[in-house]
Amino acid sequence: MLDKFSKGRSASAHVIVLGNEKGGSGKSTVASHVAVGLLKAGQRVATIDLDARQQSFTRYINNRRAWAARAGLDLEVPAHFCIEQGRTMRIADDEELECQRLIDAVNALERNVDFIVIDTPGTDSYLSRLAHSTADTLITPMNDSLLDFDVLGSVDPTTYAVTGVAHYAAMVRQVRRRRRQLDGSNIDWIVMRNRS
């Protein structure tokens, strides 16, 4: 999947992915702040929402655009795509379709922007894993709770020592390793405390 995506890219905007398999961790909120912060800093920014079911990021961008128009303000608003998951009866066809949709969106955006901010759903999916593997920077927001930490590692309930790597951290480790093997680049991974 990453091989095809890398071959399909035409330029080199910095891709920032907000990811965490746990819902409610603050991915869409942080994605909105990152995108607007970059716009306010004078950067050219585009955004992609991969959570087509919930569309929190998409609604934020659309509401910002509509409010600016109603208020007559020249407010910074990024170019935006919302990408749906494939819905055929064949997994391979869905994955091919999702990969192509993401390639097309990134190609349409990255020639004209400095940053692409991608918001992912709070579930494991092919499209989410593909986005993770294409990140230059991955930001994982999490709340200050052992329930949120559970996607990163197992914790001994008595000593609070980390006793193992959990499913999400294992997936991130895998895509980072694959990216290094493919093109020699590193994915910077930032785990941030949210709502502190």
Where are these predicted regions, by residue range?
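Intrinsically disordered or low-complexity boundary/linker segments at protein termini
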Residues: 10-14, 153
